[in-house]
Amino acid sequence: YEKSGYQSARLMLLSDNIPEVLVCANDNMAIGAMKALRQEGLKIPDDIAVTGFDGTEMSELMGLTTVDIPDYERGYLAAQFLLQNIAGSCSFDTFKIAAKVHWRKTTR
């Protein structure tokens, strides 16, 4: 994932419209993107803020702002959805998952 985050950020940097915030699908992609941004001389978070999603240990070590969803709850809901789908009673109702934002050095 880190490589895809790096490559995606490199492509983004080819445009003239650099966003204020780069929200990545997961922490590893965010770490790869941060590498590409820094190679281009951009300062995080001054020039661009970066966030991840997962709440991994690496995000803490890198000072990455991230959204953390507890693994147990995520797994439970995925299994529940799968079992309902197998039983033919799957509904696409909205559900809420408890999430926590860990504000760190990559955002202001």
Task: Please give the residue ranges for each predicted region.
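Short beta->alpha junction loops
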Residues: 1-3
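An amphipathic, basic-hydrophobic alpha-helix
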Residues: 5-8
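Flexible loop/turn connectors
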Residues: 10, 14-108
